[in-house]
UniProtKB/Swiss-Prot annotation:
Compartment(s) where it occurs, according to its Swiss-Prot or TrEMBL record: Cytoplasm
Gene3D superfamilies: 3.10.50.40, Trigger factor ribosome-binding domain, Trigger factor, C-terminal domain
One of the GO biological process terms: 'de novo' cotranslational protein folding
Location (main, coarse): cytoplasm
Function of the molecule: Involved in protein export. Acts as a chaperone by maintaining the newly synthesized protein in an open conformation. Functions as a peptidyl-prolyl cis-trans isomerase.
Catalytic activity: [protein]-peptidylproline (omega=180) = [protein]-peptidylproline (omega=0)
Stated name of the protein: Trigger factor
EC nos: 5.2.1.8
Domain remark from Swiss-Prot or TrEMBL: Consists of 3 domains; the N-terminus binds the ribosome, the middle domain has PPIase activity, while the C-terminus has intrinsic chaperone activity on its own.
Family classification: Belongs to the FKBP-type PPIase family. Tig subfamily.
PPIase FKBP-type domain segment(s): 163-248
HAMAP family, A to Z: Trigger_factor_Tig
PROSITE patterns: FKBP_PPIASE
Length: 427
């Protein structure tokens, strides 16, 4: 195989390669076996025409296109490997020469990764808007939230206030016509929770049990039911009950109700503090890592990022997200219906920061290459086991789905991130 690669820009070039006679013969054999099944010729049963007769009747050239399709993927991959390039998109392939008895010559217009010039990526000084410190107020807030979760709702005769729960019947209409989904019975609604259309809950503050009021609201312009978006509606609402939260006393007994592993309120506070310290420490480390990576990317120079890489990243991110939804039993159609969005909306959402994600990945890959990381079989095995645990899949299935080269690449990327983050200093 003769191979050459000529760059036409930093990210584009022409790959020229040939397919030798032995490979062509293999392709022609595959092509003949595929097409002969549909050929009927007098003197032969359907599909039983001989190769000699086929060549005499149609010419061997009739098999060229099918033969090329059979051998091209392997030939192209071999040419890419020999040229030592990394295409990032499907190539545009043209046949330069395809004659009987000669090697076939082809060209491929390919898009490759851009040249990356690394700047500083170790010992970076970064600023983060995060802290590991846990305050007494944060512990008290956690305790108050737990106390609220165990509060009882007690019927009250006085007027409803923010934070109270009202049990209501309601019938909604637009221009005097009731609409689907606008009716409810014995619905519990916490005032101030923002569960209902903006303006609805505020108009129930001050109402009492047994009262019927007319609540006038306007549906948001981006409301998921398009036929209601931006329209004024009237809800005839009857308040059946008003309930107020009755908080339990903060004592050792409540502490045991909140967490059966503790015996006293002080033990519960200590446990909450430890959990907050762990979560804030993790958030702090994440913030440092993010800031350090952003600094390393800013210090690097990338001449241009091919549009093809941006498009590929958008589709990858979309497929990953929608695939995750499907694992939860939510189809793409269902997701778009629930959220009132479309595939185009999701595409725009991921397109907004696709350039940043691609740029970041390219720099991290370049750092991994600069550090010449090696990956042991034990590390690959540990990565497979970790992924199997994350996705609740058998180890054997993960091994089949993910090539070793891909796993080694991911491990090297993690090592590069670790180098960037662990050497960073916080200002």
């Amino acid at each position: 195989m003769t191979v050459s690669f000529e760059k036409t820009s930093d990210t584009k070039g022409t790959l020229s390669f040939s397919i030798d006679q032995e490979t062509i013969k293999t392709g022609l054999d595959k092509a003949f076996n595929k097409v002969k099944a549909n050929i009927s010729v007098p003197g032969f049963r359907k599909g039983k025409i001989s190769r000699q007769m086929f060549n005499k009747m149609y010419g061997e050239e009739a098999l060229f296109e099918e033969a090329l399709n059979a051998v091209l993927p392997t030939a192209y991959d071999a040419a890419v490997k020999e040229a030592a390039i990394e295409p990032v998109a499907q190539p545009k392939i043209d046949v330069a020469k395809m004659e009987k008895g000669s090697d076939w010559e082809l060209t491929a217009e390919v898009v490759v990764k851009p040249t990356i010039t690394l700047g500083d990526y170790k010992d970076l000084t970064v600023e983060v808007d995060a802290t590991k410190e846990v305050t007494d107020e944060e512990v008290e807030t956690r305790l108050t939230n737990a106390q609220n979760n165990l509060a009882e709702l007690v019927v009250k005769e006085t007027a409803a206030e923010n934070g109270d729960t009202v049990v209501i019947d309601f019938v909604g209409s637009v221009d005097g016509v009731e609409f689907e989904g606008g009716k409810g019975s014995n619905h519990s609604l916490e005032l101030g929770s923002g569960q209902f259309i903006p303006g609805f809950e505020e108009q129930l503050v001050g109402t009492k049990s047994g009262e019927t009021v007319e609540v006038k609201v306007t549906f948001p312009e981006n409301y998921q039911a398009e036929d209601l978006a931006g329209k004024e509606a009237l809800f005839v609402t009857t308040v059946n009950e008003v309930k107020a939260k009755e908080l339990p006393e903060l004592d050792d007994e409540l502490a045991k109700d909140i967490d059966e592993e503790v015996e006293t309120l002080e033990e519960l506070k200590a446990k909450f503090r430890k959990e907050l310290e762990e979560s804030k420490s993790e958030a702090y480390d994440d913030a440092v890592e993010t800031a350090a990576i952003e600094a390393a990317v800013a210090n690097a120079e990338i001449k241009e990022i091919p549009e093809e890489m941006i498009h590929e990243e958008v589709h990858r991110a979309m497929n990953e997200f929608l695939g995750g939804m499907q694992q939860q039993g939510i189809s793409p159609e269902m997701y778009f219906q629930i959220t009132g969005t479309s595939e185009d909306d999701l595409h725009k959402q991921y397109e907004a920061d696709a350039d940043k994600r691609v740029r970041t990945n390219l720099v991290i890959e370049a750092i991994a290459a600069a550090e010449s990381f090696t990956t042991s079989d034990e590390e690959v095995k540990a990565e497979i086991e970790d992924l199997a645990g994350q996705y609740n899949m058998p180890v054997e299935q993960v091994e089949k789905l993910l090539p070793v080269d891909m796993l080694k690449h991911d491990i090297a990327m993690k090592k590069a991130v670790e180098v960037i983050a662990t050497t960073a200093k916080v200002k």
